[in-house]
Amino acid sequence: MTAALALSIAPEVAQAEALRERVQVLESRPGVREVLLVTEAPKRAPSERHVVLVLGGGGGGFAVVSRDGLPEVYGGLSPDQRQRLADTVGGVVIALSPPSDRPIMDREWRLSSAHVCDMRRAVDWARAQWPCSSAWVLGINNGALSAAVATASIDDLAGAVLLSCVDEALDQPQKSERMRVLAVRHCNGAGTSPNASGGCARRTLVSVHDERRVPSALEAGNALHAPRFNGKEQQVVDVVARWILTGAAPDEIR
């Protein structure tokens, strides 16, 4: 597993031509750096823009794979998924790496104040770059716990998207009542958390029905770095984008 993106980059900002993504490096805490992969859609009116910060599963690192001889970076979402989401919401998708002092993030770390500090630094940077945009966090698998912790700790967020999340992520409170939360889970694994609805009208649950499609070798190789919805990943991305824009989502994806 690649815990961080292996690129030779300047401390402040660089352009990764081969990956066709903008790379930003931030100092999140004294002496600690984190890498951001920035995917931006064509410009729209400022009031229509959204920034989505993606927090990966597994240990939280980036996976670098080769397709047709060109490197691709899976930072929670695949490059195609990041671009599709950015284009649909008319904004920016930012994949966040683990911090340099914690290349593999476990549950204890994801609940820590230092992790919140790292996420807050990324949110603050994004808000400074796109001040008229709404900021969201999207977490995948273990990253969903990070996203939920972010909404419990960082006030300057519009809400969170939790993909393939465990009940512990759903149980996290939100810092502000205005925040919205979308949880997308497998139908056969989406147990009901006592606080899954919690009487919160701004929390939306979507079930993905599992038709037991056998994953390809490429999908299996990236299982820890991207959401696994058995061939319905594109539908999930579209549902997420629609929910960010409108607040509406279907009860299920088949």
Residue ranges, per PLM feature:
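Short, surface-exposed "cap/lid" segments of acyl-processing enzymes
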Residues: 44-84, 88
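Alpha/beta-hydrolase active-site loop
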Residues: 77, 105-130
